Every structure is written in C-alpha cells, then in structure tokens.
C-alpha cells in the first residue's frame, strides 16, 4: 500500500519544508491556529509555481462554524476560481446545516464549480461536527468528493481509531478516508494499521524564533497569549520521521 501524506501549511517556508520532508500533497491554508482558513491569493500563486506535488487550497472564509450565508458562498466560489487560476490541483471545503447535517444544497454548486475547473475536492473536518456520520458519508460520496478529512469525530485521530475504521469499512473504496488531527511519527503506524486508511494528514508543526534584532515587547499584534516573535513552521525532520514510520510499516506489510 502506498501511503499519501498530506501536510497542512500556512506560509511559504512551511511549503518548502513540507516538500523537503516527503509530503505527497499540500493543504494550503492561512491561520492554522484557527483550524485553517483560505490562503491568500499570493500564497496560492506561489504554491502553484513552486510545488512539485499537488496542492489543495482550503476554502474557509472565516473562523468558527461551518454554517454559511449567501455572501460567504460567493466568497468561497471566487476563492475556488482563484485556486484554479493559481494552477492548484484541488480545494478543501465543508458546509453544514444548522442541525448538523451536511448542507448538500449549498455544497453542490461549489463542488460542481470545482469539478468544472478540473479541481479535486476534499471534504474537511466539518464532517467531525455532523450529527450522523454514517449518513453524512453517503451524502459526501454522492456529492463527488475525493476524500473526507476526519479525526473519527474525536479530539484526535488516535482517539478516533475505532470510528475511522468503521468509516473506512463503510466507504468500501468509494471515497478515501484521510485521518487527521494529532498525527505524528510515534502514532502514525498504529493509526494506519488499525484503521486501514492510506491517507494521513498532519502539520508536523514546530516553531522558530524571529530574526528581528529589535523587539518592542509592549506592542502586541494579536491575542495577548500570542508571541509575535515566534514563527510557527512545518518541521522537515518531524515530517521525515513520520514518512519513515509509514515506510517501515509498508515494508513489514509487504
């Protein structure tokens, strides 16, 4: 089995690190600290130019829930067009109704737009907030998505192993179940083996200090608990260790 390793990134430095670390696909975002929002057009175009592996743009216009209004849908549609114009390979989205069901009515035109532009579609972890995952899985398959990113409705994929395995069984090859949330080199092999997933999603996040020589500590750009002089980035080494753990599992299985 060939495992796919998708890395979510929100800056160009992390893109380079993810590629060097062995990622097979990129989820392109902004604001990973908020769960990932739509990346800037500039980052999309940069990824489209430099990435030798597929890159999918997050289409999420704001933080918070996944219940969207018409003006937000217009923004999402334009962002899908931008992803296409930037030569990306796909988009990542997810919409729910207020009752926790999949918003099929509003998802369909966005997914059809993406398909008309030759883009693949991943349904993201809005799935983990749905009221009936078994029914939601069937609806997402019918919508034509390639895969679902999910933690198995748990706080992280390790805790969601049992549900992930059930989803893989139910999907029966009709859609890929991609495990995500809290995946690292220490647990990735166990998660893959126990669930049967062949796609795994992680950030491999670390931080590095700012290169600024002058720091005005009394001025803050964001929330009080955010350090403006610590830069979150993807760790090439942590990602390589995760990729190697999967390769070792693959060699044992084959």
From Swiss-Prot:
Name of one Pfam family that matches: CutC
Gene Ontology CC entries for this record: cytoplasm
A GO molecular-function annotation: copper ion binding
Compartment(s) where it occurs, according to its Swiss-Prot or TrEMBL record: Cytoplasm
Statement: the UniProt record of this protein carries the keyword Magnesium: no
Annotated keywords: Cytoplasm
Endpoints of the signal sequence: none
Source organism, top-level taxon: Bacteria
InterPro entries per the UniProt record, alphabetical: CutC-like (IPR005627), CutC-like_dom_sf (IPR036822)
Similarity annotation: Belongs to the CutC family.
Official protein name in the record: PF03932 family protein CutC
Species of provenance: Vibrio cholerae serotype O1 (strain ATCC 39315 / El Tor Inaba N16961)
């Amino acid at each position: 089995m060939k495992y796919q390793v998708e890395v979510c990134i929100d800056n160009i430095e992390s893109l380079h690190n993810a590629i060097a670390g062995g990622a097979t696909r990129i989820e392109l975002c902004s604001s990973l600290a908020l769960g990932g929002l739509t990346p800037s057009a500039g980052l999309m175009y940069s990824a489209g130019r430099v990435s030798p592996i597929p890159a999918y743009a997050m289409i999420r216009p704001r933080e918070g829930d996944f219940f969207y209004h018409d003006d937000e849908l217009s923004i999402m549609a334009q962002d899908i067009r931008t992803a296409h114009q930037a030569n990306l390979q796909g988009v990542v989205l997810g919409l729910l109704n207020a009752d926790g069901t999949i918003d099929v009515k509003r998802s369909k035109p966005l997914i059809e737009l993406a398909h008309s532009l030759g883009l693949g579609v991943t349904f993201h972890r809005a799935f983990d907030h749905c009221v009936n995952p078994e029914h939601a899985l069937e609806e997402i398959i019918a919508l034509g998505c390639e895969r679902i990113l999910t933690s198995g409705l748990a706080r992280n994929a390790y805790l969601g192993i049992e549900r992930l395995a059930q989803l893989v069984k139910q999907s029966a090859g009709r859609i890929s179940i991609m495990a995500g949330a809290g995946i690292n080199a220490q647990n990735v092999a166990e998660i893959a083996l126990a669930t049967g997933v062949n796609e795994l999603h992680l950030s491999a996040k670390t931080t590095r200090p700012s290169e600024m020589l002058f720091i005005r500590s009394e001025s803050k750009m964001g929330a009080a608990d955010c350090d403006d002089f610590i830069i979150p980035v993807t760790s090439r080494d942590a990602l390589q260790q995760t990729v190697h753990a999967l390769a070792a599992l693959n060699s044992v299985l084959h």
